[in-house]
Design a protein with these regions (language model features):
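Membrane-embedded and interfacial regions of multi-pass energy-transducing membrane proteins
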Residues: 1-248
Length: 248
Protein backbone atom coordinates (compact mmCIF):
# COMPACT_ATOMS: atom_id res chain seq x y z
CA UNK A 1 0.00 0.00 0.00
CA UNK A 2 2.92 2.34 0.70
CA UNK A 3 4.34 1.80 -2.78
CA UNK A 4 0.89 2.27 -4.31
CA UNK A 5 0.69 5.65 -2.57
CA UNK A 6 4.15 6.59 -3.89
CA UNK A 7 3.12 5.61 -7.42
CA UNK A 8 -0.08 7.66 -7.07
CA UNK A 9 1.97 10.67 -5.96
CA UNK A 10 4.24 10.40 -9.01
CA UNK A 11 1.17 10.14 -11.22
CA UNK A 12 -0.25 13.33 -9.67
CA UNK A 13 2.99 15.20 -10.39
CA UNK A 14 2.96 14.06 -14.02
CA UNK A 15 -0.73 14.91 -14.43
CA UNK A 16 -0.11 18.41 -13.05
CA UNK A 17 2.75 18.96 -15.50
CA UNK A 18 0.49 17.94 -18.39
CA UNK A 19 -2.49 20.03 -17.28
CA UNK A 20 -0.46 23.12 -16.29
CA UNK A 21 2.96 22.99 -17.98
CA UNK A 22 3.51 26.74 -17.51
CA UNK A 23 2.75 26.77 -13.77
CA UNK A 24 5.02 25.74 -10.89
CA UNK A 25 4.13 22.71 -8.82
CA UNK A 26 1.91 23.51 -5.82
CA UNK A 27 3.44 23.21 -2.40
CA UNK A 28 1.83 19.91 -1.42
CA UNK A 29 3.34 18.23 -4.51
CA UNK A 30 6.73 19.95 -4.48
CA UNK A 31 7.33 19.36 -0.76
CA UNK A 32 8.63 15.82 -1.32
CA UNK A 33 10.87 16.62 -4.31
CA UNK A 34 14.51 17.59 -4.56
CA UNK A 35 14.56 21.26 -5.62
CA UNK A 36 17.40 20.51 -8.04
CA UNK A 37 15.03 18.34 -10.09
CA UNK A 38 12.68 21.24 -10.87
CA UNK A 39 13.32 24.22 -13.12
CA UNK A 40 14.18 27.62 -11.64
CA UNK A 41 10.50 28.55 -11.77
CA UNK A 42 9.51 25.36 -9.95
CA UNK A 43 8.07 23.65 -13.02
CA UNK A 44 8.45 20.00 -14.02
CA UNK A 45 11.16 19.61 -16.67
CA UNK A 46 11.07 17.14 -19.52
CA UNK A 47 13.84 15.06 -17.96
CA UNK A 48 11.98 14.90 -14.64
CA UNK A 49 8.78 13.85 -16.41
CA UNK A 50 10.59 11.01 -18.19
CA UNK A 51 12.26 9.93 -14.94
CA UNK A 52 8.94 9.93 -13.10
CA UNK A 53 7.36 7.95 -15.92
CA UNK A 54 9.92 5.19 -15.36
CA UNK A 55 9.43 5.36 -11.59
CA UNK A 56 5.64 5.29 -11.81
CA UNK A 57 5.48 2.33 -14.19
CA UNK A 58 7.86 0.14 -12.21
CA UNK A 59 6.43 1.01 -8.80
CA UNK A 60 2.80 0.46 -9.75
CA UNK A 61 3.46 -2.83 -11.58
CA UNK A 62 6.30 -4.52 -9.67
CA UNK A 63 5.87 -2.94 -6.22
CA UNK A 64 2.12 -2.38 -6.11
CA UNK A 65 -0.26 -4.35 -8.29
CA UNK A 66 1.64 -7.65 -8.63
CA UNK A 67 2.52 -8.09 -4.92
CA UNK A 68 -0.90 -6.94 -3.70
CA UNK A 69 -3.20 -8.64 -6.23
CA UNK A 70 -1.15 -11.71 -7.18
CA UNK A 71 0.94 -12.22 -4.05
CA UNK A 72 -0.97 -11.09 -0.96
CA UNK A 73 -4.56 -11.61 -2.13
CA UNK A 74 -3.68 -14.83 -3.95
CA UNK A 75 -1.87 -16.24 -0.92
CA UNK A 76 -5.01 -15.77 1.15
CA UNK A 77 -7.70 -16.83 -1.33
CA UNK A 78 -6.08 -19.66 -3.31
CA UNK A 79 -5.65 -22.17 -0.41
CA UNK A 80 -9.19 -21.43 0.77
CA UNK A 81 -10.73 -22.08 -2.64
CA UNK A 82 -8.91 -25.37 -3.29
CA UNK A 83 -9.20 -26.73 0.27
CA UNK A 84 -5.46 -26.59 1.02
CA UNK A 85 -4.13 -25.99 4.56
CA UNK A 86 -1.48 -23.54 3.32
CA UNK A 87 0.69 -22.75 0.34
CA UNK A 88 2.97 -25.58 -0.78
CA UNK A 89 6.23 -23.90 0.27
CA UNK A 90 5.79 -21.42 3.16
CA UNK A 91 9.54 -20.74 3.34
CA UNK A 92 9.63 -20.05 -0.38
CA UNK A 93 6.77 -17.64 0.25
CA UNK A 94 8.82 -15.78 2.84
CA UNK A 95 11.87 -15.74 0.55
CA UNK A 96 9.67 -14.19 -2.14
CA UNK A 97 8.47 -11.42 0.16
CA UNK A 98 11.92 -10.70 1.57
CA UNK A 99 13.28 -10.38 -1.98
CA UNK A 100 10.38 -8.06 -2.76
CA UNK A 101 11.10 -5.87 0.28
CA UNK A 102 14.83 -5.66 -0.47
CA UNK A 103 14.18 -4.89 -4.14
CA UNK A 104 11.67 -2.20 -3.19
CA UNK A 105 14.13 -0.56 -0.80
CA UNK A 106 16.94 -0.62 -3.39
CA UNK A 107 14.68 0.83 -6.08
CA UNK A 108 13.25 3.47 -3.75
CA UNK A 109 16.80 4.48 -2.72
CA UNK A 110 17.66 5.09 -6.39
CA UNK A 111 15.26 8.06 -6.41
CA UNK A 112 17.49 10.00 -4.03
CA UNK A 113 20.92 9.32 -5.54
CA UNK A 114 22.52 12.55 -6.85
CA UNK A 115 22.75 11.17 -10.40
CA UNK A 116 18.97 10.75 -10.50
CA UNK A 117 16.88 7.63 -10.99
CA UNK A 118 16.69 5.39 -14.03
CA UNK A 119 16.77 7.08 -17.43
CA UNK A 120 16.05 4.04 -19.58
CA UNK A 121 12.33 3.50 -19.09
CA UNK A 122 10.52 1.20 -16.71
CA UNK A 123 11.55 -1.93 -18.66
CA UNK A 124 15.22 -0.87 -19.01
CA UNK A 125 15.45 -0.29 -22.75
CA UNK A 126 18.75 -1.25 -24.35
CA UNK A 127 21.27 0.09 -25.04
CA UNK A 128 20.09 3.17 -23.09
CA UNK A 129 20.18 1.27 -19.79
CA UNK A 130 23.81 0.40 -20.52
CA UNK A 131 24.98 3.89 -21.48
CA UNK A 132 22.88 6.03 -19.10
CA UNK A 133 24.86 7.99 -16.48
CA UNK A 134 28.22 6.66 -17.69
CA UNK A 135 29.74 10.08 -16.99
CA UNK A 136 29.35 9.53 -13.23
CA UNK A 137 32.62 8.83 -11.35
CA UNK A 138 31.23 5.75 -9.56
CA UNK A 139 28.99 3.57 -11.73
CA UNK A 140 27.97 1.49 -8.73
CA UNK A 141 26.46 4.58 -7.11
CA UNK A 142 24.10 5.62 -9.89
CA UNK A 143 20.33 5.50 -10.10
CA UNK A 144 20.40 3.34 -13.23
CA UNK A 145 22.57 0.69 -11.55
CA UNK A 146 20.38 0.66 -8.44
CA UNK A 147 17.33 0.40 -10.69
CA UNK A 148 18.72 -2.67 -12.45
CA UNK A 149 19.62 -4.31 -9.13
CA UNK A 150 16.14 -3.61 -7.80
CA UNK A 151 14.56 -5.10 -10.93
CA UNK A 152 16.60 -8.31 -10.54
CA UNK A 153 15.41 -8.70 -6.94
CA UNK A 154 11.77 -7.93 -7.79
CA UNK A 155 11.71 -10.37 -10.70
CA UNK A 156 13.28 -13.04 -8.47
CA UNK A 157 10.49 -12.42 -5.97
CA UNK A 158 7.81 -12.84 -8.64
CA UNK A 159 9.37 -16.06 -9.97
CA UNK A 160 9.51 -17.61 -6.49
CA UNK A 161 5.87 -16.75 -5.92
CA UNK A 162 4.85 -18.15 -9.31
CA UNK A 163 6.52 -21.51 -8.58
CA UNK A 164 4.74 -21.65 -5.23
CA UNK A 165 1.31 -20.94 -6.73
CA UNK A 166 1.69 -23.49 -9.53
CA UNK A 167 2.85 -26.22 -7.12
CA UNK A 168 0.08 -25.44 -4.63
CA UNK A 169 -2.71 -25.54 -7.22
CA UNK A 170 -1.47 -28.75 -8.84
CA UNK A 171 -0.57 -30.76 -5.72
CA UNK A 172 -2.71 -29.48 -2.82
CA UNK A 173 -6.23 -29.57 -4.26
CA UNK A 174 -8.68 -31.33 -1.95
CA UNK A 175 -10.31 -34.64 -2.90
CA UNK A 176 -12.90 -34.13 -5.63
CA UNK A 177 -11.49 -30.77 -6.75
CA UNK A 178 -10.97 -31.65 -10.41
CA UNK A 179 -9.60 -29.25 -12.99
CA UNK A 180 -13.10 -28.53 -14.27
CA UNK A 181 -14.26 -27.64 -10.74
CA UNK A 182 -11.47 -25.16 -10.04
CA UNK A 183 -12.81 -21.66 -9.30
CA UNK A 184 -12.17 -19.05 -11.95
CA UNK A 185 -9.86 -17.10 -9.62
CA UNK A 186 -7.65 -20.17 -9.12
CA UNK A 187 -7.47 -20.70 -12.87
CA UNK A 188 -6.46 -17.05 -13.24
CA UNK A 189 -3.68 -17.49 -10.67
CA UNK A 190 -2.45 -20.67 -12.37
CA UNK A 191 -2.34 -19.09 -15.83
CA UNK A 192 -0.70 -15.95 -14.43
CA UNK A 193 1.95 -18.07 -12.71
CA UNK A 194 2.84 -19.81 -15.97
CA UNK A 195 2.94 -16.48 -17.82
CA UNK A 196 5.32 -15.10 -15.19
CA UNK A 197 7.60 -18.13 -15.58
CA UNK A 198 7.65 -17.60 -19.33
CA UNK A 199 8.07 -13.82 -19.41
CA UNK A 200 10.25 -12.88 -16.44
CA UNK A 201 13.39 -15.06 -16.82
CA UNK A 202 14.43 -13.33 -20.08
CA UNK A 203 13.82 -9.93 -18.48
CA UNK A 204 15.88 -10.84 -15.42
CA UNK A 205 18.73 -12.22 -17.52
CA UNK A 206 18.66 -9.06 -19.65
CA UNK A 207 18.95 -6.94 -16.49
CA UNK A 208 21.95 -8.99 -15.32
CA UNK A 209 23.57 -8.65 -18.76
CA UNK A 210 23.04 -4.88 -18.65
CA UNK A 211 24.66 -4.78 -15.22
CA UNK A 212 27.64 -6.65 -16.67
CA UNK A 213 27.82 -4.10 -19.49
CA UNK A 214 27.82 -1.24 -16.99
CA UNK A 215 30.08 -2.64 -14.30
CA UNK A 216 32.21 -5.46 -15.74
CA UNK A 217 33.15 -4.15 -19.18
CA UNK A 218 30.99 -6.65 -21.09
CA UNK A 219 29.29 -5.81 -24.38
CA UNK A 220 26.07 -7.80 -24.52
CA UNK A 221 23.90 -4.82 -25.46
CA UNK A 222 26.49 -2.43 -26.92
CA UNK A 223 26.46 -2.47 -30.73
CA UNK A 224 29.60 -1.82 -32.70
CA UNK A 225 30.17 1.88 -33.35
CA UNK A 226 27.73 3.05 -30.70
CA UNK A 227 27.94 6.77 -29.93
CA UNK A 228 26.48 8.15 -26.75
CA UNK A 229 25.95 11.63 -25.36
CA UNK A 230 27.68 12.52 -22.11
CA UNK A 231 27.21 15.40 -19.71
CA UNK A 232 28.56 18.68 -20.97
CA UNK A 233 29.21 17.51 -24.51
CA UNK A 234 27.21 17.10 -27.68
CA UNK A 235 28.80 13.78 -28.59
CA UNK A 236 30.97 11.79 -26.21
CA UNK A 237 32.15 9.58 -29.03
CA UNK A 238 32.48 5.84 -29.37
CA UNK A 239 32.35 3.61 -26.35
CA UNK A 240 35.59 1.90 -25.42
CA UNK A 241 33.91 -1.50 -25.38
CA UNK A 242 31.56 -2.56 -28.15
CA UNK A 243 30.29 -5.91 -29.27
CA UNK A 244 28.56 -7.41 -32.26
CA UNK A 245 25.29 -5.63 -31.56
CA UNK A 246 23.12 -8.55 -30.42
CA UNK A 247 23.31 -10.72 -27.29
CA UNK A 248 21.78 -13.57 -29.29
Amino acid sequence: LLFLFIGFYLMMVMRWSIASPDKPLPGFLAAFLNEAWLSEEGRVTGDLYNMFGAMHGTIMVFLGIVPLAFGAFGNFVTPLQIGAPDMAFPRLNMASYWSYLLGGIVMFASFFIPSGAAEAGWTMYSPIATTAQLDEPNLWYTGQTFWLLGMVLLITSSLLGAVNFITTIINLRCRGMTWMRLPFFVWAMLVTGFLLLLAFPPLEVAAIMQLMDRLAGASFFIPTGLNFTGAGSVDAGLLDVSGAGSPL
